[in-house]
């Protein structure tokens, strides 16, 4: 009986020690999908983008960034065809005022595929932003696909950066995402 009690005590102490020791095995990167309603006063148009936070398992490197795909300059040309594009990194204070639709936890490998995809969009030559066919929704959709989500692009949502993530949430009920009005 005393031996059994000691074994139990040792197991409890080992479990406690393991729980208190920092481990990179607990590291993770979370990718949150955000939208912004737009503001005429702030000269901001509706937009969707991703926020990435966490720590890589294999290196311990901290991840704290956000990516959105947008036109380099907003002019009437955006209404008539492709224009030059960029990956835009929002200021932290701006991110806190946006709608967070849902979050995925991804592996280091998936994060790196997302990073490579973002770099490909950032470095694509020519006029790559198209309001109706290759916009912020297209970019965020590609990141969502890399995260394993089912994604589609209904034409009636291609200019609705808040409604589109709600649509993606309905295609992926495992997210348990709330609809943002």
Each model region followed by its residue ranges:
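Glycine-rich catalytic cores of cysteine/serine-nucleophile enzymes that process amide/ester linkages
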Residues: 28-100
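Mid-length scaffold segments of soluble, non-membrane domains
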Residues: 85-130
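Activation targets extended, charge/polar-rich intrinsically disordered C-terminal tails
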Residues: 29, 37, 115-181
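Bacterial N-terminal signal peptides that target proteins for export
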Residues: 2-13
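Serine/threonine-rich, low-complexity intrinsically disordered segments
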Residues: 4-6, 26, 72
């Amino acid at each position: 009986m005393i031996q059994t009690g000691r074994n139990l005590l040792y197991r409890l102490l080992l479990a406690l020690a393991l729980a208190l020791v920092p481990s990179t095995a607990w590291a993770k990167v979370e990718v949150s999908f955000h939208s912004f309603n737009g503001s005429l006063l702030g000269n901001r148009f509706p937009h969707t983008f991703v926020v990435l936070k966490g720590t890589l398992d294999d290196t311990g490197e901290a991840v704290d960034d956000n990516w959105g795909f947008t036109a380099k300059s907003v002019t009437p040309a955006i209404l008539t065809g492709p224009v030059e594009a960029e990956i835009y990194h929002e200021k932290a204070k701006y991110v806190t005022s946006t709608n967070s639709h849902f979050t995925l936890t991804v592996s280091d490998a998936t994060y790196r595929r997302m990073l490579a995809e973002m770099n490909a969009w950032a470095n694509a030559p020519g006029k790559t932003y198209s309001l109706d066919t290759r916009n912020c929704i297209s970019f965020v959709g590609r990141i969502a696909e890399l995260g394993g989500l089912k994604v589609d692009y209904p034409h009636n949502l291609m200019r609705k950066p808040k409604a589109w993530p709600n649509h993606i949430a309905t295609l992926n009920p495992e997210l348990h995402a709330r609809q943002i009005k």
